[in-house]
A protein has these predicted regions:
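Acidic/His-rich active-site region of diverse nucleotide-sugar glycosyltransferases
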Residues: 1-42, 46-47, 55
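Short loop segments at secondary-structure junctions
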Residues: 35-36, 64-65, 106-108
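Catalytic donor-sugar/metal-binding loop of nucleotide-sugar-dependent glycosyltransferases
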Residues: 39, 46-49, 55-77
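Activation segment
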Residues: 41-42, 80, 103
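Non-transmembrane alpha-helical segments in soluble domains
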Residues: 58-59, 100, 139
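Nucleotide-sugar-dependent glycosyltransferase catalytic core
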Residues: 77-97, 132
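Non-catalytic, C-terminal membrane-associated alpha-helical segments of glycosyltransferases
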Residues: 94, 110-170
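Catalytic-core region of carbohydrate-active enzymes that cleave or remodel glycosidic bonds
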Residues: 96-101, 106-110
Length: 170
């Protein structure tokens, strides 16, 4: 166990490729970061109430030169309490908006566009065609994008994401 956690904070990508199994998945409900990484990249974005904050942290992690280790050696139990959840359409709207903010901040424009198309369709499907909520979400998204700091992942970070088969298109 210590061995796995020790490798989680390693800045050398080659170490993962040559010595340890590597998976590109990152779960928001169970993760560990080295303190130095959080000091370097910052913590959760304060305007993310729910959804996609793990993507924001993982892209910041890659930009800082770290690798992400996913291991099946650790068990996390994540209980979802339906009494503590927002209505489904609100939850879907937050996820759509937050995902787009994260992609806008970290990925090249091509991926911003493909995410917008795919997540628009997904939101409209999951919300049973809630057009009014869709347009309100887009207006809120555009307001947040005006103040979000855009700092796109560089070529080596993008290559890393492609190497680990990260989900870039949607």
């Amino acid at each position: 166990m210590y061995e796995l956690l020790r490798y989680c904070g390693c800045k050398s990508r080659n170490l993962f490729y040559s010595h340890k199994p590597f998976y590109n998945l990152f779960f928001g409900y169970g993760h560990v970061f080295p303190r130095d990484l959080i000091v370097e990249t910052g913590f959760y974005q304060t305007d993310f109430f729910y959804g996609m904050e793990e993507y924001d942290l993982s892209y910041a992690t890659v930009k800082a030169g770290y690798s992400i280790l996913f291991t099946k050696e650790i068990l996390v139990i994540h209980k979802q309490n339906p009494n503590g959840r927002e209505p489904s359409v609100v939850k879907q709207a937050r996820m759509f908006e937050n995902k787009m903010i994260v992609v806008y901040k970290h990925l090249p424009w091509l991926y911003v566009m493909t995410h917008f198309i795919m997540w628009s369709a997904f939101f409209l499907y999951k919300s049973k065609g809630s057009i009014l909520v869709y347009f309100k979400t887009i207006l809120s998204m555009l307001r947040r994008m005006k103040i979000a700091r855009r700092n796109v992942i560089g070529a080596s970070g993008m290559q890393y994401l492609k190497d680990v088969q990260a989900r870039l298109w949607y």
